[in-house]
Amino acid sequence: MGRWIVASAWPYVNSIPHLGNLIGSILSADVFARYLRLKGEDVVFVSGSDEHGTPIEVEAIRRGVHPKQLTDQAHEYVKKLFEEFRISFDNYTRTENPVHKEFVREFMMKLYQNGYIFEQDDVLPYCPRDKMFLPDRFVVGTCPYCGFEKAYGDQCDNCGRLLHPTELKNPRCSICGGPVEFRKSKHWFFNLPKLQEKVEKWLRESNLPPNVKNYSLNMLKEGLKPRSVTRDNKWGIPAPFPGAEGKTIYVWFDALLGYISATKEYGLKKGDPELWKKYWFNPETKTVYFIGKDNIPFHAIILPAMLIGSGDPYVLPSYISATEYLMYEGEQFSKSRRWGIWIDEALEILPADYWRFALIRMRPEAKDTNFTWSEFLRIVNTEMNDDIGNYVHRVLRFIESKFGSVVPEPGSYSDADKEFEKAIRETPRRAEKYFEEVRLKQALGEVIELARKGNQYLNTKAPWDKIKTDPKDAATTMYLAVNSVATLAILLAPFTPDSAERLWKMLNLPGSVHEPGRWKQAGEMIIKPGHRIGKPEQLFRKLPARFDKEIASKLQEIRRKVMEKRPPLLRW
């Protein structure tokens, strides 16, 4: 049994996550964690609400409340939505949790004591109109490297370069739109150049995917610069360094350490305060991070540097799955323009399994992907229903009507039978290969392909005719078919957990499809002759043929219902 930490990027809870946030980290991480559990691995799956920093502070001021009132509502609501999406966290926590706050302060002091944190004056953006120092993300200007006119003060979303606000051309305040000034303020910095050699050695020897590894090595070629770890805003974890009164820890350093503190909190809940070290200090532990591509520098450079700089034997990232962007009907999701679908709106439209399946099929693994309602309709009606749902229903209904719900004894295998049995046995191995490469879209593709082969097999064998002329051949066909359905149930479990469990019950199989170690039964003939199946039901339901044309006109009413359910401080 292997030991794994599956880490999803922490959603920033100044708003409800949208579909792009969901597939970029949380859902992908959940599918992978569920797969590992099915394999019988020892898994801790962690994430939490990222709730510090100026964006939330500004939103709270706008609403006339303390930031914690806002994040209390947001955290509980988002946590509930993830539960409804069947996200199987072992611990979903928050950056306001006392365990996290204490851990961050202790960790940052270790970096300080080890000589990796130093103090110096910094020149920071200040908005004279709003009378406040601005966080990097609240400064917008032209990127000095690529000329992108909407680059942020910490990073250009176009070319991906990490920036300092002073590098931007024509910097402006994103709150009021006015020009910013730069004023001196004392701050504490993480000495990344001092750790560059160690980070580069680790990167070159790592098994990170090419998009992450190459991007990070290119950044190292330019040379790392010290990064400020403190901010002047009030809402955050107080900086622990001598003389740093009134400063808070920069939210990125705060949130990155959440993966460890969440594991620590998980151990405390289980009554074992040292459990987290059995994962994080064990060189055999594999740590897999699920993030969006814009977060690569923080996870592939800054986090490893922090872990190395601590002097403790932390295991460094084993794999970083960084997705490209999911667009919505050709444009980026936008809260201000109400452009996109947010996860509570999605659940108002259809149950979670439909979204889980469709989003994994659209997962932007190699390039930006466009969510369209027409593609969503095709996936639901063709792949979920025609390919998988229809096949399952054909098999179970035939056994119910022609064999009295009892799985028949097979006869000798024809070439077609042998070929289909081979497909049943080999599909889990192919899906497993894609899972190990964190190519979840392709793994789900193997599940769909097995169902397609099943439909073709039934059409070729025509058991509805053979039951009259060669009942033994029909029995063989249905014996193999029902076992392929059992394999489908196991393979679907990471993707559509509720539907997979319902299918397991329809097959009248013992226990839960989600039991640890269940994966080893995929591809095996686990349903024996004489087994009685349960009552067949429709696994999925089709959407109306004009769903993609009509959904736009229905969104306004859907959003009205959703807004009524949202906590008051999360209504737009």
From Swiss-Prot:
Compartment list: Cytoplasm
InterPro entries registered for this protein in UniProt: Anticodon_Met (IPR041872), Met-tRNA_ligase_1 (IPR023458), Met-tRNA_synth (IPR014758), Methionyl/Leucyl_tRNA_Synth (IPR015413), MetRS_core (IPR033911), MetRS_Zn (IPR029038), Rossmann-like_a/b/a_fold (IPR014729), tRNAsynth_Ia_anticodon-bd (IPR009080)
Chief subcellular location: cytoplasm
Motif 'HIGH' region per UniProt: ranges: 11-21
Keyword Cell membrane carried by entry: no
Enzyme class: ligase
A GO BP entry: methionyl-tRNA aminoacylation
CC terms in the record's Gene Ontology section: aminoacyl-tRNA synthetase multienzyme complex; cytosol
Binding site for Zn(2+): C143, C146, C156, C159
Keyword Protein biosynthesis: yes
Catalytic activity of the protein: tRNA(Met) + L-methionine + ATP = L-methionyl-tRNA(Met) + AMP + diphosphate
Enzyme Commission numbers on file: 6.1.1.10
CC cofactor note: Binds 1 zinc ion per subunit.
Cofactors, names only: Zn(2+)
Residues binding ATP: K335
Molecular function in Gene Ontology: ATP binding; metal ion binding; methionine-tRNA ligase activity
Keywords recorded for this protein, A-Z: Aminoacyl-tRNA synthetase, ATP-binding, Cytoplasm, Ligase, Metal-binding, Nucleotide-binding, Protein biosynthesis, Zinc
SUPFAM superfamilies with a match to the protein in the record: Anticodon-binding domain of a subclass of class I aminoacyl-tRNA synthetases (SSF47323), Methionyl-tRNA synthetase (MetRS), Zn-domain (SSF57770), Nucleotidylyl transferase (SSF52374)
Residue numbers covered by motif 'KMSKS' region: 332-336
Function according to Swiss-Prot or TrEMBL: Is required not only for elongation of protein synthesis but also for the initiation of all mRNA translation through initiator tRNA(fMet) aminoacylation.
HAMAP family in the record: Met_tRNA_synth_type1 (MF_00098)
The family this protein is said to belong to: Belongs to the class-I aminoacyl-tRNA synthetase family. MetG type 1 subfamily.
Name assigned to this protein: Methionine--tRNA ligase
